[in-house]
Amino acid sequence: MSENKRIDLHTHSLFSDGELLPSELVRRADVIGHDAIAITDHVDASNIEVASKIAEAVNDIRDNWDITVIPGVEITHVPIEVIDKLANKARSFGAEIIVVHGETIVEPVRPGTNRMSAECPEVDIIGHPGLITEEEVQIAVDNDVSLEISARGGHCLGNGHVAKLGLEYGANLVLDTDTHAPGDLINYELAERIAKGAEIPEEEVPKVLKDNPRKILKKHGII
């Protein structure tokens, strides 16, 4: 994969509440300098099968364009007791990246979502985990679950807290956009500034933007 190109593992298409078809989402990401992008539309038990449609769309793009595209899901606002079951079910439908909608401070996410996600090895990323606790961060580290620094308005208000604890406990931090609209995608330079704004030390920024997301992709044999 190229140097200083984006890897965004949390975006949405028309398969949930995003504005773009998967193909246009990927095309726009490619134009502004992405090496890889995951399409992780919202799911719960009512629509978990959408993972197979995302995978089908992604396969067409993978076969024809020079950008790594990954089918995924974001498990969103579900009873915490079914996170593990839904993660496994999403995998069976072709999802290669599993994000869970974490306890952002701007939505009424069910308490315990961060902890249950951290305990689930099938989960790759806890999206915008808000005021995640030290204990939850340690559990995430133990289970190789990454924590997200978010570029999305509102969700980003917890970035400083997530970065501080993540760095202290050695968590895998990744920076994603949670894109819903064309203007939500960002280039590498803006991602660098967002990471620094979360008080991530300059020497750690390349790990957050490149090394850590690549670890996730390598774990699943995607790259």
Predicted features, each with a name:
Residues 6-16, 39-43, 129:
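Histidine-centered catalytic micro-motifs
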Residues 10, 29, 41, 128, ...:
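Conserved, mostly hydrophobic/aromatic
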Residues 12, 43-44, 74-76, 103-105, ...:
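Catalytic metal-binding/acid-base residues of hydrolase active sites
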Residues 17-20, 48-52, 109-114, 136-143, ...:
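Histidine/acidic-residue-rich catalytic or RNA/ligand-binding cores of hydrolases
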Residues 27-37:
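Catalytic domains of carbohydrate-active enzymes, especially glycoside hydrolases
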Residues 42, 171-185:
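Short acidic/histidine-rich active-site segments
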Residues 48-149, 217-223:
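Extended substrate/RNA-proximal surfaces in nucleic-acid metabolism proteins
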Residues 193-223:
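Mid-to-C-terminal alpha-helical segments outside catalytic/metal-binding sites
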